[in-house]
Amino acid sequence: MKIKKIKLLKALALTGAFGIVATVPVIVSSCSSTDNNGGTGDNNTGGGGSGTDQQQGTTYTPAIKSDVTLSGALSKIYDTTNTGDSRKNTNTLIAEDIKANPENYFTNGEDLKKVEGWSVTVDGSFDSNSVWTGDAYSKWSAVADTHKGVYKSTSKQLNINSLKDLKSQLDTSAKIKAICDESNLVFSTADADSYKIQNELGFTGGDLLHINVTATQAGKTLNMDLGIPVSDLNLKITDLKVSVTASNNSTGNNVAAVSDLTTNFTYNIGIKEEVTAPTEKPNLAKTDKGEVMKVLKALGYTQTGDETKLDNDKVSNSLGLYNCEFTAVSATPVEGSEDKFTIKLKAKPLTDYVWEDGTNTEKEISFEATFTMTGN
């Protein structure tokens, strides 16, 4: 489902560019952060060194690319591992990636990569003030009769510069209703002018944001859980500021200091490959257990009106694997079991979407499902 977008963010209520409160920790702050790692440069320092540049003592001045477009895991821009004060903000994570992969950011990055002792700071002008306030996801999602929907794979990706920006793009009832309609949250008799965003963001499965939407229908409040896969979000920062602190190697090569270099930074969040196996036990006729499409139909994965084809959104919502096109491979009974099957499918990212590893090639996925067998 990805690289057109309003498209982000395991790790993911958020603040700043990526900061979720309560169920999701803070991701970014308005201040710059520094990567103090030493790098992986050439350790030859003259004397017995064999590198020609080391003997000449070249000093490289970082030259940033005007546009940087990358794709990959959410963890590259949102700390999905640490919590609380140990959680790194988005500035820090981008700075670390620049130091580790300077060739992606600088025209002379291959040269910089060979030098030790320089460091990077980044300023994305991320707003640290959270606008997602109110009840935590764990509370509002537990309200009785909450209607759930997930942003369809056919909907456009969303370009945002922060989670505050995501909310600002949903600043009218008309815009909120439109995105709800695209997520199977359609209520024909609801007051079209009553749609509002409420409470904190939620984040589950490492790849699904949850937005609380309310509307009025027949005098009563509708409570909705709008899910947006993070792979539908693109982080786009105009004039991302990058500064480099010089190295001070007494022998060999060095990197010169530069301040406030700017680039237009775009990050396409990749699709997480993990699947969540279904827990329900649908009915399956014993006579159908050898037919893969009938097994998948029993799981509710086929298209309405055409049971020979899979419905991408139905499969995605069940397995938690979003923005892919699915094809059936096999449904094989588990050895020694009467009611358990190993299901294999092929999944390929839709146009403009990629896996977390940056590729968009077809991959095989598998999971087990248990059925209630019927008939003789």
From Swiss-Prot:
Its main location: membrane. One of its GO terms (cellular component) is plasma membrane. It comes from the Bacteria. Pfam families: MpPF1 (PF07668). A lipid is attached at C31 (S-diacylglycerol cysteine). Belongs to the p35 lipoprotein family. This is Lipoprotein p33.
